[in-house]
Amino acid sequence: MNRKVLKVIDGETVFPPPIWMMRQAGRYLPEYRETRKKAGSFLDLCYSPDLAVEVTLQPIRRFGFDAAILFSDILVVPHALGRDLRFEEGKGPLMTPIDADEIFWLETEGVAKRLEPVYETVRLVREQLPDETTLLGFCGAPWTVATYMIAGHGTPDQAPARLFAYRFPEAFEKLLNDLADVSAEYLIEQLGAGADAVQIFDSWSGVLDEDCFERFCIRLVARIVQKVRAVYPQARIIGFPKGAGMLYAGYREKTGVDMLGLDWSVPLSFAALLQEEGAVQGNLDPLRVVAGGNALDEGVDAILERMGQGPLVFNLGHGITPQAPIENVQRMIDRVRGGKS
């Protein structure tokens, strides 16, 4: 088995570095938009294995990325917990905000089993992927998932969730613990279905102060990692605490993740120091892919120059945007793999 992404996660230096993109199955691809229309709703797309397999494989067929990531959404976990969830064009995910009393009535028993269509997608993708392509599963980190459950939608700085945590600490701690336990079961099921590694997305960790980052992010991700490794001791886990800044230091050691996903705001000098401790993933600004040209080339070259001699999975610093031209994605891949565009 020659899955380059797994080699990097294990600490090997691979050159040229393997590459994939967060949200690589998405609206920038015309074939994705066609499949999305067939599905009806975004959730129907997530829960229909045949269609979810198709969109997971589309960027692999087109670009030959070194990893496929399961097509789903971080909010299927609260949906499985019984919370309503819908996606509206231009508004993103919408939920009825949970209140403190409701948290104590959340029933977590057997929740992961309700997500069987997701595991079927994993099984089918693994069967159809080229053998050298890594298959990644994922979940949202408890803090990030909780922010949507509390506000009912995304907010610029997640003030509703932060205020909720200060006002209702007991309820908030229970919510985070419940989400961690269900998420661990969810990842265990994905690994059992054929995922090679999993990523924990903490997209809103950057809005927290240091104390809350330790209590709401690090503690809960560590809890997930411990529970997953109790079942799969060799499980490879990627942590992505977007916006963590200086708090990236120590994150790997405290949580137990194998590889650090870095957002584009992380200085490359700091990223290189983090790489001395183990594998890193990232961290091109997604808007450089939209811009193309010299802006794209210079961004790619800077990352390769600073981190290409160590364990690196080349990625964006967050998800690719719908506005990204396909030719710019190909230009980025060619440049990473050694062909100048």
Curated annotation (Swiss-Prot):
Reaction(s) catalyzed by this protein? Answer: uroporphyrinogen III + 4 H(+) = coproporphyrinogen III + 4 CO2
Superkingdom, taxonomy of origin: Bacteria
> What does the entry give for GO biological process?
protoporphyrinogen IX biosynthetic process from glutamate
GO MF terms here are: uroporphyrinogen decarboxylase activity
Which keywords, in A-to-Z order, does the entry hold?
Cytoplasm, Decarboxylase, Lyase, Porphyrin biosynthesis
Q: Where does substrate bind?
A: R23, Q24, A25, G26, R27, D73, Y148, S203, H318
Give the metabolic or biological pathway. Porphyrin-containing compound metabolism; protoporphyrin-IX biosynthesis; coproporphyrinogen-III from 5-aminolevulinate: step 4/4
Task: List the residues marked with site Transition state stabilizer.
Answer: D73
| Subunit comment | Homodimer.
Per the record, the similarity remark reads: Belongs to the uroporphyrinogen decarboxylase family.
What NCBIfam families does this protein's entry cite? hemE (TIGR01464)
Query: Do you know which HAMAP family this protein is assigned to?
Result: URO_D
From the Swiss-Prot or TrEMBL record, give the protein name: Uroporphyrinogen decarboxylase
